[in-house]
């Protein structure tokens, strides 16, 4: 059974492990810890008593930005990202948020999940993300009107 709840201080070591495995260019431990506070709605996803994913989202007035979402690679493609995003959107609506923004690598297959949930492509940021092998990759800016 899946449980989704607020991220706690004791979760960061596990979140960092997931971050390192889930992203092409992962956040540092410091960046992960610094994206916390009263303006954030940060959730963890627990399956079989183990954290397998998380979402980092900042809220400002009636808008929110999804800064990071990560699901452990062995659990990707099983609906856990959709489950976590659904809970995040539900809680954002309860807070009066009207628009959820995100940006994603052009090559990231999560774009298709975002589109299914209701996100629309708003803009392209040319050469925004660095590639581990060198060079740059475009970012796709997306918005979901709640």
UniProtKB/Swiss-Prot annotation:
Active site feature: 103 (proton acceptor), 114 (proton donor)
InterPro entries: AcTrfase_RimI/Ard1, Acyl_CoA_acyltransferase, GNAT_dom, RimI, YpeA/RimI_acetyltransf
GO cellular component: cytoplasm
Residue positions binding acetyl-CoA: 69-71, 108
UniProt cross-references to CDD domains, sorted A to Z: NAT_SF
Keyword hit for Transferase: yes
Any matching Pfam family: Acetyltransf_1
Known EC number: 2.3.1.266
Catalytic activity from the UniProt record: N-terminal L-alanyl-[ribosomal protein bS18] + acetyl-CoA = N-terminal N(alpha)-acetyl-L-alanyl-[ribosomal protein bS18] + CoA + H(+)
Superkingdom: Bacteria
Subcellular location, record wording: Cytoplasm
Keywords carried by this UniProt record: Acyltransferase, Cytoplasm, Transferase
Main location: cytoplasm
Record keyword Acyltransferase present: yes
Domain N-acetyltransferase: from-to ranges: 2-146
Molecular functions per Gene Ontology: protein-N-terminal-alanine acetyltransferase activity
Function per UniProt: Acetylates the N-terminal alanine of ribosomal protein bS18.
Listed NCBIfam families: PRK09491.1, rimI
Protein family: Belongs to the acetyltransferase family. RimI subfamily.
Name this polypeptide is given: [Ribosomal protein bS18]-alanine N-acetyltransferase
Species this chain originates from: Haemophilus influenzae (strain ATCC 51907 / DSM 11121 / KW20 / Rd)
Gene: rimI
